[in-house]
Amino acid sequence: MSLENKAGTCNLAGKFCTVAFLEKWRYRLGESSLRRQMKKNHRQVKAFNLRQAKEVGILFDATTLEKYEPVRSFIAFLQEQGIHTHVLGYINDKKIPDSYLLRRSFHFFSKNDLSWIFKPVSQHAINFYEKNFDILFCLDTENLFPLRYIATLSRAHFKVGRFFPDHQHFDFMINLKEDTSVAYLIEQIKVYLSNLRTSNESEINKPIPAEK
């Protein structure tokens, strides 16, 4: 390799490192902002099961159809139980697919709806986390910051989602191990929240192992 080619490679590597460092720094600023907002976030925690819930919020990663389809089936299941649903999906890209824009009663936001520190700033996102749902179902299995931001600030009475060791911001957490798919998370949510005894406080705010 010539000296000129080596210099070009080094320059590219340097630029990549700079971009990666800057993005990491921006995420840290976002985390710091979220921690400050958490201190101002007051809500009434109250457990609900699927027999009691009347209105729920569903928050999910809508980037791929693989994750979208199980969520759509879950929404249909909830509506069959007479539960009113509010749905917000995040597209981990700059453009929302045109087909998504035709979905009635669904709202979406994308990377273009994030601030410089990755904070969701779309009106749909703000309206969502300010609503007092009976239950918030966060169906994100990858701990994406924009979704975690909304879930953390949500005023829902009862927050349900996957257990993450470093971010325990749900009231009811399911510890996925081998199968970390959205479909499996939903399956476990249906099992546990159909049988949850809301008077038993020992079941709240601890990770629940997924059923075999």
Predicted regions and their residues:
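N-terminal amphipathic/basic-hydrophobic helices that include classical n-h-c signal peptides
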Residues: M1-T18, K212
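Active-site-proximal region of nucleotide-activated glycan assembly enzymes
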Residues: C17, Q168-K212
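Nucleotide-activated donor-dependent transferases that construct or modify glycoconjugates
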Residues: Q44-K46, L50-T63
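Residues at the starts of beta-strands that form the adenosine-phosphate
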Residues: E55, I83-H86, F158
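Conserved nucleotide-cofactor-binding alpha/beta core module
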Residues: Q79-Y129
